[in-house]
């Protein structure tokens, strides 16, 4: 969902 988390 988040680009930095990649979920």
UniProtKB/Swiss-Prot annotation:
Classification of source organism: Eukaryota, Metazoa, Ecdysozoa, Arthropoda, Hexapoda
Domain of life: Eukaryota
GO biological process annotation, one example: neuropeptide signaling pathway
GO CC, alphabetical: extracellular region
Key words, A-Z: Amidation, Neuropeptide, Secreted
Residues found modified as Phenylalanine amide: 7
Localization (cell): Secreted
Record-given protein name: FMRFamide-15
Record family assignment: Belongs to the FARP (FMRFamide related peptide) family.
Keyword flag Secreted: yes
């Amino acid at each position: 969902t988040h680009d930095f988390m990649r979920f």
